[in-house]
Amino acid sequence: MVCSPVTLRIAPPDRRFSRSAIPEQIISSTLSSPSSNAPDPCAKETVLSALKEKKKKRTVEEEDQIFLDGQENKRSCLVDGLTDASSAFKVPRPGPDTLQFTVDVFHFANDSRNMIYITCHLKVTLAEQDPDELNKACSFSKPSNSWFPVEGLADICQCCNKGDCGTPSHSRRQPRVVSQWSTSASL
C-alpha cells in the first residue's frame, strides 16, 4: 500500500471568482480569451451539456451531504485510521498556516477512472484560539490504541472515542470563524 502526503495550505480566497466556481470555470476564465470559436450559449448542445453538468454536480453534492451527515459527530477526527488504513495528520505542523496529512491510495473495484476527488471541509479559526473539542485535528495511533492531537492537550481527542465532538466541554473561549471557502485540487 502506498501513502502519499497531502498538504492543505490555508490561504485567503481569490475574490475574482464566486464560491460556486468549479475548476473548469476557473481555468477557462483565466486561460481563455474571447474567440470566435466559442460555442453558442443558446445552442441545443450547449444547453444540454450545461444541464448534464448541473445534474452531475448536484449528485456529487448530495453524496457529500449523505457522508457528512454520518460524520457530523466525529468532527476533526481522522476516523479511517481506526481501520487498516494508515491515514494520519503530520505532527508537528510545517507552519501555522499549514495542516498536512497522509491518506492511503485506493481504487474502487470496476472503476476505470484514473482520478479521485478529495473533499475537505475546513473551519478556520484565529491562531490564538486554543485547540478544543470543536477546533482540533486528531489522528488514531494503533500502537498506543489512542487518539492524539496535532497540537493542544491530549484530552481534546477523547470525544473521538465517544463519537460525540459536538459540544466543547472545556473550551476556553468561543471559536471565531475568520472565513470559509472551498477549493479543489487534483493529485
Curated annotation (Swiss-Prot):
Region ranges (Disordered): 166-187
Coiled coil: none
Record-given protein name: POM121 and ZP3 fusion protein
Top-rank lineage group of the source organism: Eukaryota
Single GO cellular component term: nuclear membrane
Matches recorded under Pfam families: Zona_pellucida
Compositional bias of kind Polar residues: 177-187
InterPro entries according to UniProt: ZP-C (IPR055355), ZP-C_dom (IPR042235)
Tissue: Expressed in spleen, thymus, pancreas, testis, ovary, small intestine, colon and lymphocytes.
Residues in the signal sequence: none
